[in-house]
Amino acid sequence: MVGLGRALTLESAAPDAIAQVRRAWEATPASSPAPTSDAARPGEATPASSPVPYTGAARPGEATPASFPAGDAPSPVLFASFAFRSPARSVAFVPALTLIDEAGARWAITAGIGQAPDPLAAVDAALAEARTAPRVPDSLTFGQGSMSRTQWRDSVQAMAARLREGAADKAVMARDMTVRCSRGFDERFLLERLSDLYPSTWRFSVDSLVGASPEMLIAARGGTVSSRVLAGTCKPGEGQALASSAKDLREHELASESVSSILERLCLDVRAQGPFLLALPNVTHLATDIHARLGAAHLLDLVAALHPTAAVCGTPRDAAMRLIEELEDTERGRYSGPVGWVDTAGDGEFAIALRCGLASGTRLRLFAGAGIMPDSDPDLELTETEAKMRPLLDALGV
C-alpha cells in the first residue's frame, strides 16, 4: 500500500491524540465535499474519495481489477504515526492518491484529484513523479546521539538498581545516533532497501519516519484481530540460550501479559500462541502471537488501549514511564509509537515503530531500545541496541 500526496492532515500533541484522530476519521465520510485547503482540523471533512480500478501500471500477464464487483473495492485509507508520549507530535493523513495491490488486483483510491476531469490521468501523473529513481546516499558521517555510550550504560545501571528496589518490574531504555548525508536522505531508497533486506518485517515510511518493524501492535480484518509481541533478544544463532534464559522469559511474559490482559477486556476469544523463536537477519527474539475476535471496539480504540505496551515502555506502565522520564535522556518522538493505517470499515494494521529512523534534511536519526530488568547487564543491553540499529545501517550499506 502506497500513499502519495495529502488530501487531509491531522496533527496533535495531546495525550489523547489517538482518540482525537479516531473521532476525526469517523466524522470524515468518504463522500464529503472537498474542503478549501489540503489540511483540516479534527472534525473537518475530507475530500471526496473513491476507489478506481487502475490498469495503467499493469505489466503483461498481470491481473487488473476492471471487472471486479463494486463491493470488492477497497475503502479510503488514513495513514497515521503516533508519538510514544505527549507532547511529541502525532500525525495522521489521507493521501491524495492511495495505491493498493492485493490478490492480483490493483486499485487507486483518489481523494481530491478524484474530482479532476480525468482521474486516471491524474493517477498516471502522480505515478510518473513517484517513479523517478531514488537518490542513493553517499559521504555518510556518523554522530553521537542524545546520550553518549557511557552515559547510556550508566543510566541502564541506575535503572536496574531502581528496579531491584521495586520501582517497577521492567522499564525500557531507548537511545539514538545520527547519520548525516550532504545530499539528504531519500526515504524511497531506504524503504526499498529495507524491503529487500528485511522482507519478513512490516516496512513503513510515514511523515519521514522510516523503518522495518518486526512487531505488530494490532491488526484488524473482517472482525478478527491479531498482535505479535516481542521481548527478549539475542544475537543470531543463540536462540536456544534465549529460550532457556529466566531473565528473558520473564521479560517476555510481562510484555505478553500486558497485551493479553487488555485484549481480554476489549475483545472476545483471546488466544495466545508462544513464546517461540523469531529469527531475523540481525537478531533473534522471543515472540508470542495473540489472536481474538473484535467486539464493539474500533481498531483505534485498541491502539489507544494497548500503547505503550510493556515491550516499549515497561510494567507497571505508569511506574515504568516515570523511570523513563527520569533516566532516559532521549526524546523518542514517534519512535516506539504506533504506525500504520485504518480504512473506513475499521480494518487496518498498526505496527510499533521500531528499527527505524527519522529523516530530516541532511540528518537521519536512528533509534533503538532495550528492555531493562533488575538483573540487566548494561554492556549486553548496549550491544542489543546496536544490533537493533542494524536494519537502517544495512539499508545505508554501512
Predicted regions and their residues:
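Contiguous alpha-helical scaffold segments within structured protein domains
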Residues: M1-P15, G114-Q115, A121-Q157, V179-R180, ...
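Non-catalytic accessory segments adjacent to catalytic cores
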Residues: D16-P33, A66-T178, A246-L249, L266-L268
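A residue-level signal for conserved active-site and pocket-lining positions in enzyme catalytic cores
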Residues: A80, L99, G166, I218, ...
